UniProtKB/Swiss-Prot annotation:
PTM annotation (Phosphothreonine): residues: T199
Keyword field contains Secreted: no
Membrane as UniProt keyword: no
PANTHER family (UniProt xref): HEAT SHOCK PROTEIN 70KDA
Family annotation (Pfam families): HSP70
Composition-biased stretches (Polar residues): 609-623
Protein name per its UniProtKB record: Chaperone protein DnaK
């Protein structure tokens, strides 16, 4: 049976895992790393680089190297958070026709799910190389606090990458699965504090033994989808840029190349300061002015970094308080605290979490891999490989519709266990009203306009009647992925209208289909590119070995043989310069045949010479006296009873 893989699609890094028997296995990528940078680059010769190779060339190609795209997924261009990001990244973020935030690369506009799909394709390929078979299905994780449009966009990314997304699960829940899978059975309440590259989540999860099943029930979740390691980097970049401006008067924000170098240096310094007290940020030739080149050299202490990011760390505490309140628990009722996400390696974060929860966080969970491992466990549950685990997740935000006076009426409260269904009856606001618009909202505010609009649809042909008489039944249905279906029905006529909520923006079916096609054509191009590279390598290797053999065996070859092989070599060299695969294969065969004949003839010649020499040696041996070279051995008989 084909495997379902688990993918942690992260803001900064991504990771893929699979269940092998009863143990989850994190799969190493082609570079031998267990995590892959979530970076996609477009080169001038139309190659798409993903992961480490994209990261390596980011300094020389800043405007076409896309990182932290997850921060834009499912977001509107006018979102203040997106506007803040525009000023901080070297690539171009623009407004799509549907109002979403897209990116522009080489005069082409691309949707964030398209870029994320490239990362997912790399994860898919990593798993396929390891498993030795095609992978078609995956469980993909998202931040618990992702709204409906962000979940839809993540699902779209999976489809574009050629994956059927069997389930979208929340990152903290996945981490809890990874933690609780092999722990002793019994009831406990854990807090999963997940501070990743771009998002923060806190989930309170109860692990219990119910009828022989290991049950993971999310009691409450909260978070901030625009708070993570990237923000810590940005705070440090701002500080370094302002210090440099003080010294030189030059603003590095206007130079994409300098900004990219600054980002790399900030990330490196932040990581170093998790274990060291001080580091140097040293960037020679960062920029230049009329007076010559300028260098950036700033000493940075851990204390300084902590003062720069203190407010960011503090921002994580309020969601923790809310999650505990929603779960109806106090800090003392939490048995274990688990840290997930690379940013939790920062000592200040660990100290803050310990102070808030009053206990030291667990150190036996790998913050970079736990989420992918949990996704792989959930994948195995769905495929039937793992049988005694039940996962009960929740919807992170309340869902409802806009009613008279611009008020949001909630049908499903936040932290409701999913899947779930809720129905409520509404009526018309005016006499003889023949149509109603159902405006679907997500959020916690009373005022409808202050919440996230998920979409709207009309229910028409309602028989005219006084206001308040018609009965319109609205049903909200959330599936296990946290994705919403809404339907409305006029109880008098039985007329119904329903939609799967696609954010008022989002990608249409046609756009997704076009992107799937585009990704498939790229996959075909990549395959051809790889085949050509392998063929050229094969040709170069054969040319090298033939030239070496001709040099070593110059005296053994006839003039005709030399001429034939030299011609075959030069024709293959010429073919390799071109792009005609069939011609390279043809010339490769000619040289292979010629070199094989040469090797065969020389081997036969050497073999007959060797046999003649051996025959001569044997005849000399037989004339020697028999005693020579013979040694008498003394044997002692061992009786059976002596053996015992």
């Amino acid at each position: 049976m084909a495997k379902i893989i688990g993918i942690d699609l992260g803001t900064t890094n991504s990771c893929v895992a699979v269940m092998e028997g009863d143990k989850p296995k994190v799969i190493e990528n082609s570079e031998g790393h267990r995590t892959t940078p979530s970076i996609v680059a477009f080169t001038d010769d139309n190659e798409i680089l993903v992961g480490q190779s994209a990261k390596r060339q980011s300094v020389t190609n800043p405007e076409k190297t896309l990182f932290a795209i997850k921060r834009l997924i499912g977001r509107r261009f006018d979102d203040p958070i997106v506007q803040k990001d525009i000023k901080m990244v070297p690539y171009k973020i623009m407004k799509a026709d549907n109002g979403d935030a897209w990116v522009r690369v080489k005069d082409q506009d691309k949707a964030p799910p398209q870029i994320s799909a490239e990362v997912l394709r790399k994860m898919k390929k990593t798993a396929e190389d390891y498993l030795g078979e095609e992978v078609k299905e995956a469980v993909i994780t998202v931040p618990a606090y992702f709204n409906d449009s962000q979940r839809q966009a993540t699902k779209d990314a999976g489809r574009i990458a050629g994956l059927e997304v069997k389930r979208i699960i929340n990152e903290p829940t996945a981490a809890a699965l990874a933690y609780g899978m092999d722990k002793k059975r019994g009831d406990s309440v854990i807090a999963v504090y997940d501070l990743g590259g771009g998002t923060f989540d806190i989930s309170i999860i109860e692990i219990a033994e119910v009828d022989g099943e290991h049950q993971f029930e999310v009691l409450a979740t909260n978070g901030d989808t625009f708070l993570g390691g990237e923000d810590f980097d940005l705070a440090l970049i701002e500080y370094l840029a302002s210090e440099f401006k003080k010294d030189t008067g030059i603003d590095l924000h206007n130079d994409p190349l300098a900004l990219q170098r600054l980002k790399e240096a900030a990330e490196k310094a932040k990581i170093e300061l998790s274990s060291a007290q001080q580091t140097d940020v040293n960037l020679p030739y960062i920029t230049a002015d009329a007076s010559g080149p300028k260098h950036l050299n700033i000493k940075l202490t851990r204390a300084k970094l902590e003062s720069l990011v203190e407010k960011l760390v503090e921002r994580t505490i309020e969601p923790c308080k809310t999650a505990l309140k929603d779960a109806g628990l106090t800090v003392s009722q939490i048995n274990e605290v688990i840290l997930v996400g690379g940013q939790t390696r920062m000592p200040l974060v660990q100290k803050t979490v310990e102070e808030f929860f009053g206990k030291e966080p667990r150190k036996d969970v790998n913050p970079d891999e736990a989420v992918a491992v949990g996704a792989a466990i959930q994948a195995a549950v769905l495929s039937g490989e793992v049988k005694d685990i039940l996962l009960l997740d929740v919807t992170p935000l309340s869902l409802g519709i806009e009613t008279m006076g611009g008020v949001m009426t909630k049908l499903i409260e936040k932290n409701t266990t999913i899947p779930t269904k809720a129905t409520q009856v509404f009526s018309t606001a005016d006499d003889n009203q023949t149509a109603v618009t159902v405006h679907v909202l997500q959020g916690e505010r009373e005022q409808a306009s202050a919440n996230k609009s998920l979409g709207r649809f009309d229910l028409r042909d309602i028989p005219p009647a006084p206001r308040g008489v018609p009965q319109i039944e609205v049903t909200f249905d959330i599936d296990a992925n946290g994705i919403l279906n809404v339907s409305a029905k006029d109880k008098a006529t039985g007329k119904a209208q329903s939609i799967v909520i696609k954010a008022s923006s989002g990608l249409s079916e046609e756009e997704v289909a076009a992107m799937v096609k585009d990704a498939q054509s790229h996959a075909e191009e990549d395959k051809k590119f790889k085949e050509m590279a392998e063929l050229r390598n094969q040709a170069d290797s054969l040319i090298h070995s033939c030239e070496k053999s001709m040099k070593d065996l110059a005296d053994e070859l006839s003039e005709d043989e030399k001429r034939g092989i030299e011609t075959a070599i030069s024709e293959l060299k010429e073919a390799v310069q071109g792009t005609d695969k069939a011609r390279i294969e043809d010339k490769l065969k000619v040289l292979t045949d010629a070199s094989a004949k040469m090797a065969e003839r020389i081997y036969a010649k050497k073999s007959s010479e060797g046999q003649a020499a051996q025959g001569q040696t044997q005849s000399q041996e037989s004339t020697k006296p028999a005693e020579e070279g013979v040694v008498d051995a003394e044997f002692e008989e061992v009786k059976e009873e002596d053996k015992k």
